[in-house]
A protein has these predicted regions:
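Conserved Rossmann-fold NAD(P)-dependent oxidoreductase catalytic core, especially the SDR/UDP-sugar
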Residues: 84-86, 96-138
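Alpha-helical substrate-binding/gating segment
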Residues: 181-189, 197-231
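Mid/C-terminal beta-alpha module of Rossmann-like enzyme folds, strongest
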Residues: 217-264, 297-300
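C-terminal amphipathic/interface module of NAD(P)-dependent oxidoreductases
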Residues: 267-301
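N-terminal Rossmann NAD(P)H-binding glycine-rich loop of SDR-like oxidoreductase domains
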Residues: 3-23
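NAD(P)H-binding glycine-rich loop region in Rossmannoid oxidoreductase-like domains
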Residues: 35-39, 43-94
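Conserved beta-loop-beta element that borders a ligand/cofactor-binding pocket
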Residues: 116, 149-172
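Glycine-rich "substrate-gating" loop/helix at the edge of Rossmann-like oxidoreductase active sites
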Residues: 135-140, 166-174, 194-204, 215
Length: 301
């Protein structure tokens, strides 16, 4: 299979590209800096500006599957007005460019996997949220809705579209999770805020394998929550980390301190969703890491 990956140099994209190559697929990565991209042997890099099909759109006609992972890191800095605009624009512009390239192609890919976020649902308290739950009304939910809409038009062209609403993707050295682990490494771990907020998560391996599963399964279309079947509260997360790492769990971090330091960005850790992967499990996907404890043991090896 010939796969085009946009955003294939980030930590999720890099893992996906390695898995695709390991399965023997032909992979091309769209990147702003093709000359500097560090890619596995046999992976082709193609330049793009993440805003238009110019210079690369013809590659669509050589592609069986497209995966769009492009989006500026939510945790890469304080959510100033300028940064929020970059977060939104990076997602929507890339999605529209891919959609335009597919629309212009004489031969189109069979499937497009469009990345999104579990923030689509807003902040739902203790209510379970699955793929049928409505969108929230906060800023991040609105961005997620627009992100998903950016490639919706390909469905009218007969392209099977899968939307992956990612929870926080866990990796021991990359992404946001090393920051979660840091207080425990320093022996000052404790609950954040009330500790009752939900922490939706998925192990990196499952995020990658679920993507491959949906690409290959021709019955898969529509929205899928990329979240483990065992969502945990912040308090349970902290206690599990402390137990696995054999660290104390005594030092609470008040919500007001998080809000003072991080501003609106603090909502990523002070609020959350009790998300479950209903459609993914109904389709038959079996999680490699269904529980937080099992995931932590693997990540901290």
């Amino acid at each position: 299979m010939r796969v085009l990956v946009a955003g294939g140099t980030g930590f999720i994209g890099s893992a996906l590209v390695r898995a695709l190559r390991g399965d023997g697929h032909s992979v091309t990565v769209l990147t702003r800096n093709p000359d500097k991209a560090r890619l596995p042997d046999g992976v082709r890099a193609a330049g793009w500006d993440a805003r238009s099909p110019a210079g690369w759109g013809h590659l669509i006609e050589e592609t069986d599957a497209v995966v769009n992972l492009v989006g500026e890191n939510l945790g890469g800095g304080l959510w100033t007005a300028k940064r929020k605009q970059r977060i939104r624009d990076s997602r929507i512009n890339a999605g529209r460019a891919i959609s335009q390239a597919i629309q212009a192609a004489r031969q189109r890919p069979a499937v497009l996997v469009q990345s999104s976020g579990i923030g689509y649902y807003g902040f739902s308290g203790d209510t379970f949220v699955d793929e049928a739950s409505p969108a929230g009304s906060d800023w991040l939910a609105q961005v997620s809705v627009a992100w998903e809409d950016s490639t919706r038009a390909v469905e009218d062209l007969g392209v099977r579209r899968v939307v992956a609403r990612n929870a926080l993707v866990l990796h021991g050295r990359e992404g946001i999770f090393p920051l979660v682990l840091l207080p425990f490494r320093l022996f000052v771990g404790g609950p954040i805020g009330s500790g009752r907020q939900w922490f939706p998560w998925i192990h990196l391996d499952d995020a990658v394998q679920a993507t491959l599963f949906l690409i290959k399964n021709q019955d898969a279309s529509g929205v899928y929550n990329f979240s483990a079947p065992d969502p945990v509260t912040n308090d349970k997360l902290g206690k599990t980390i402390a137990r696995v790492m054999r660290r104390p769990y005594y030092f609470p971090v008040p919500a007001i301190a998080m809000k003072t330091v991080l501003g609106e960005l603090s909502t990523l850790v002070l609020e959350g969703q009790r998300a479950v992967p209903a459609r993914l499990q109904e389709l038959g996907y079996i999680f490699r890491f269904p529980t937080m404890e099992g995931a932590l043991i693997d990540l901290l090896r």
